[in-house]
C-alpha cells in the first residue's frame, strides 16, 4: 500500500485565512479547544464567531472572551470558514436546516469526522469547499498539547474542491489549530470512517466479548470476583500495555513481560488462525458499514437517542450489558472495595 502524505507547518500558508470570518458551530469538546488554539495562533478575536444555543457552552465561550451568536442563520451568512463541531448525530438536522440555505457559495466547511460526509447526510453546493481536519485526540488534549507547544495527530482531506484551492485552505486550517506541528496525515472521510466504525462495531465488541468470556471461565474455575477484576483490568495493566504499545511498538512492548508471559502470548496468538475474526471484520466492514446499513439504522434511532429512560435504545443496551456476570461482579467488588479504589 502507498504511504500517506504527511503535511507539516511549512506546507501551510496562514495568509489564506487573513481577513476571513471564521465561524465555529459548537463550543464543546473539539469546538472549545480548536477555537482557542486558532485564536492563540493569531486569528483576531473579532474574526471568530461561536454559533451556539444560549446555554452553558455559550456562557463558557463568552467567559473565554469569544463573540457568540445564538442565531444560526446570521452566523451561516457571514462564514468564510465554518467548523462543524457539534455531535455527528445532530449535524444533519442543524447544518442542513439552519446553515445550508444561508451559507456563502464559496465557504469552506470543515468537518472533524468523516461519517456524515461518507453517508451523504450533509448537503453542500458544488461551489463550496468541504475539508476534513480530524484530530485523533479528545479536545482537552488538542488544547493541552497546543499550549505545551506540541502537535497532535490529525487526519486531513479534501472531500469537495469547490473553489479550486480547498487543499491549501485545509492545510491552513490544520496549521492554525496546531495540527501540522507534528504532521497531519493525508486521509479521507471514507478511510477515517471505515477505521472508526470497524473499531467501534467489531474490534472493541470482540475485546469486550473476550474479557466477558475469560471472566466467566475463570469465575467458574473458582477465581474470586475481587481477584478477577483486579487481574483483568482494575490494576490498569491493559491500559499500561496499550500505552507501551503506542510508545515502543505493538509487539516490542511484550519484552516488558515475564519470559513465561512472552512465550504464552506469542505462542497463543500465532496459533490462532484468525479466520473467524477476519470473516467477522469483513462482514462488518462491507455488509454493515460500507453498505450504509448501520448508518440507516442509526439515523432511524436518532430521535430515540435523545430520550430518557426505557425509550432510549442505548439505555436498553446498557441494561443488558449490566446483566452480564462480569458487570454484576464488578459492581459488587466496587461497592465492597470503595475505599481501596479511591
Ligand atoms: P460535543 O458533544 O462536545 O459538542 C457539544 C457542542 O455541540 C456544544 O456546543 C453543544 O451546544 C452543541 N450541540 C449539541 N447538540 C446540539 C444541537 N442539537 N443543536 C446545536 N448545537 C448542539 O462534540 P465533540 O466536540 O465531541 O464532537 C464534534 C465533532 O468532532 C464531531 O464531528 C466528532 O466526531 C468530532 N471529533 C470528536 C472527537 C472527540 O474527542 N470528542 C475527536 C475527534 C473528532 P448546545 O448543547 O449548547 O447547543
Predicted regions and their residues:
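A short, basic/flexible loop-to-alpha-helix module at the beginning of a structural domain
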Residues: 2-19, 73
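Rossmann-fold NAD(P) dinucleotide-binding segment
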Residues: 72-121
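Active-site-proximal catalytic alpha-helix in oxidoreductases
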Residues: 164-222, 226-246
